[in-house]
Amino acid sequence: IGVPSAHAVLDARRAASELSGARLGDRTVVWGHSQGGGAALWTGALADDYAPDLPLSGVVALAPASDPLALIDALTEVTGGSIFASFAVAAYTSIYDDVTFREYVRPGVEPIVRTLSRRCLSEPGVVVSILTSLGLSTDPEIFASDPTAGPLGTRLEQNAAPATVSAPLLIGQGGDDTLVRPDAQRAFVEGLCASGQRLEYAVYEGRGHIPLVERGSPAIADVFAWTAARFAGEPVDDGCRSLPQR
């Protein structure tokens, strides 16, 4: 959820400066993947107003959930989609009074949804192991009504990533991502370019949503190199000029 996530990131950076013994520089680059990538985009958009004392040197968003509506719509086609759906339902029902379990979650499934929402996708194969641990051989059908309609649909749309970020931006996308789809991400990037955003965009062919950030992914080395360049104050390439044609 955009605004509170951005505020939490910036508050955490402020708090880190107060840690005794911490040797932090005066430059900050925000990283995030998936929903964290969406939070990184929101952080970049709100930083100037919310935390003018913390100028950002860059924002890195890997497979960001830039379009929550499209993300929710894709969940039925993804292994472990029920887990990602549970993350969304738990978050939105906790923040918005008009989004309720009763309206959107099938009767009898609520305990499973609440359990799934507390699990962390921390390593390869964890999606299947989580479902197995709950005695589920397949993804449970969670939604009682269309999650892209009504109050939840409205709230999802409100949390689409902003059209501009106040810092240099790197977006990385897995070419084989079935959750955050490459075509949807490309459309988002084109919108950013049209709004005048300065960015670099990299597609990693053969990488899915989680493999994009697993050990051995070329995206990891690229993120470190890009971040080091921002810390060094190097100019940013204008990736909008070099976007491959559709």
Where are these regions (language model features)?
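Short beta-strand/loop motif that positions the catalytic acidic residue
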Residues: 165, 170-177
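C-terminal catalytic histidine-bearing segment of alpha/beta-hydrolase fold enzymes
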Residues: 148, 153-154, 186-246
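Acidic catalytic loop of the alpha/beta-hydrolase fold
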Residues: 175-180, 210
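Primarily recognizes the serine-hydrolase "nucleophile elbow" in alpha/beta-hydrolase
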Residues: 14-84
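Loop/turn elements at helix/coil->beta-strand transitions in domains of secreted/extracellular proteins
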Residues: 25-27, 54-58, 165-168, 195-200
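Alpha/beta-hydrolase active-site loop
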Residues: 1-20
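Accessory cap/linker subdomain of secreted extracellular hydrolases
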Residues: 62-162
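Short alpha-helix in the alpha/beta-hydrolase fold that links the catalytic acid
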Residues: 43, 167-169, 181-191
